[in-house]
Structures are given as C-alpha cells and as structure tokens.
Amino acid sequence: MGTYRVAVYAICKNEAQFARRWMASMSEADRVIVLDTGSEDGTPDILHELGADVTREQVEPWRFDTARNRSLALVPGNMDICVCTDLDEVFRPGWRAALERAWCPGVGQAHYPYIWSFTADGKDGVVFWADKIHARHGWHWAGPVHEILRSDAPVRAVFVPDIRLEHHPDPAKSRGQYLPLLELAVAEEPENDRNVHYLGREYLFYGRWDDCIATLQRHLAMPSATWRDERAASMRYIAKAYQEKGEGG
C-alpha cells in the first residue's frame, strides 16, 4: 500500500458495539491483528468478517501487559511499523499517509495527539501526546494496568501532529478489574509516580477516602511527580475526598 508495511494490533473482549467503526478506521493499515481474550458477544466474528486476523486466547492471570505482548507477538516479523489501538478508539482519516510522511529509516516510535475526552459541545477536551506507534522489533509492554511501551535500546522518535486518535469509550463499562491491578502495579514499582496517582484516583472512585488522601499525598511528595496537570488532579481528588468525609472547608 505504501513505503512501509503497517500493522494495527489490539486486544479486545466484548466490544461488538465498536468493532465496525474501529475496523473502518484501521482499514488504512496493511494488516489488522486482534487478540480476543474471551468475548461472548460476537466481537471476533465481526472483526474476522471485516478482514482482521483474530486469535482467541484466555490470559490468566489477567494483566494488560501480558495481553498486549501476546497480541504484539502475533504481528508478522516482516512488518515495519506497529500501531497499537483499542477498539473504543478511532483515527481521523489520513493517518496512514501522515505516518508515512513522518517515518524514515532509523525512527523507532511516533508520538501523536490523543483526544482522550470531549467537551459537552463536541470540542476537544483532554488531549495529550500518545506513543503507541513503534517499530516492529525491540519493544515490549510493561505494567499490569496502564501499561507502557518500553524499548530495548535508545529510540529516535518523531512527532506527527497530523495523526489524531480519538477516544470514544463506553461509559457503562465496568472498572472492577482496575483496582487490584493498580495495587499490584504499585507493589511492583513503588516509585512509579504515574501509577501511584492512578491508584489514588481509583480509591476516590471506590469511596475509599482515607486511602485516596494518603496515596495522593504520597504522589505529590514524590520527586519524580513533576507533571503539573497530574499534580493538579491529585490536589483536586484530595480536596474531593476531604469534602466527602465532611472535612472540607
């Protein structure tokens, strides 16, 4: 199709409602490869019908990094560029051409705008740079939840503002698996400020006010916790927890 061989890869479970929209968005790739981890709603059949290569496999015990690494392993070794997305995400059209314009020999990763949420009137809400486009070899996923890509060697990256990935989640989707995985993630890497922040936020969602406050105060005290947006969020969550405890000002 183009200068480089591009493969999209993903994991999924019970996401039939997103399957057709996602496949339409990912169709600019040469290959679409999916690891289905136990769907009961026909998701694999829809994806296969629309041209995806689907493998079904249970991942036990569940960890997102294990599932992502297994899905990445399904990508043929002769692909040049791997694009990891979730089924509740869509690229704006033209992403493949934008990627090929920016990619060149020696590049190992692409960063691109990720529209995580939208305002009530449909405008971009929270936007940050995502980094889940990478060369086929020399990469792996790490972390039981909120997993991140890690490279085996120093990486040359390119920034591609013309690629726009949008997040359109199911608001009814259960968060039940996240808390134990976040607790595991922090136990494995106690100094990972990002996961400490996420754990404190999760305690807020569960109404565990004291755990929320203690965890986020620890986050704010960590020397590595320098991202202003995340620090501000921790402060807001602490204030909310105190308010829920009846101790707000």
Name what the model sees in each region:
Residues 5-7, 31:
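Cell-envelope/extracellular polymer assembly enzymes that use nucleotide-activated donors
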Residues 191, 228-230:
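Structural signature of alpha-solenoid helical repeat junctions
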Residues 80-91:
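The conserved acidic donor/metal-binding loop of glycosyltransferases
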Residues 10-28:
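Short, well-formed alpha-helical segments that are part of the catalytic scaffolds
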Residues 69-81:
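Active-site nucleotide-sugar/metal-binding loop of Leloir-type enzymes
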Residues 25, 35-48, 59, 86-87:
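A conserved acidic beta->alpha catalytic loop
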Residues 65-72, 91-214:
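Catalytic-site signature of metal-activated, phosphate-bearing donor transferases
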Residues 17-20, 41-50, 94:
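Acidic helix N-cap motif at the loop->helix transition within catalytic regions
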